Amino acid sequence: VITALIDADSLCYAVGFSSNDTEESIAIARLEATMTELCMELDCQDYKGFLTGRGNFRDSIAVTVPYKGQRITEKPVHLQSLRCHLVTSWGFKVVEGIEADDAVGIAAYAVPEDETIMVHIDKDLNQFRGWHYNYRKKEKYYVSEFEGLRSFYTQILTGDRIDNIVGLKGIGPVKAKRILEECTNENELYQAVLKAYEGDQQRVLENGQLLWLQREANQVWQLPS
């Protein structure tokens, strides 16, 4: 039995922003149609969906700049109604203290990787090994354990503008790829990133802890020993 693990935050925003000029009932109907289409595309026997609730452990980790401090606060008009609909009609779960991304990871790593498919449009989740489905591109793809680690260390280099995580100045995805392309294991990835940060372990640790998505409850990333 394959279970679809759905990051529902982006789903609500995508449907919500496209429905700002409509009535609430139309926005909910669009969400319902999107969910039905998703289930047909994936042909899964089961699904679990997650929404981000209150609190985030990352807020206390961010020292360089506030976590998500630059994020534009504009929200879709019907966001709350859409979230409530997914909870009441589809059984989605609101998680607190973590993000929906973390909840997807915890659920994915609790079972063998061929029993789930992670449904999202967020590159952050590409650090998880296993099957993924980008519902915007309608693309199914597989990420290996090492590919997931490389994606994670790439983000430590580049940072994440959306979440206000500051990377190295002048390093985007292309330069980051060049820095990491010779690496074959996690220690080499870490050493390459540490060298790029001129040995600043604290900055690497801070960015890593902000960017690392949980594989089990209460997990916080630590520097490789």
Regions found by a protein language model. Give the residues of each.
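Extended two-metal-dependent nuclease catalytic cores across DNA- and RNA-processing enzymes
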Residues: A27-R30, C44, K68-P224
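Domain-level signal for Mg2+-assisted phosphodiester chemistry and nucleotide/NA-binding surfaces
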Residues: V1-C84
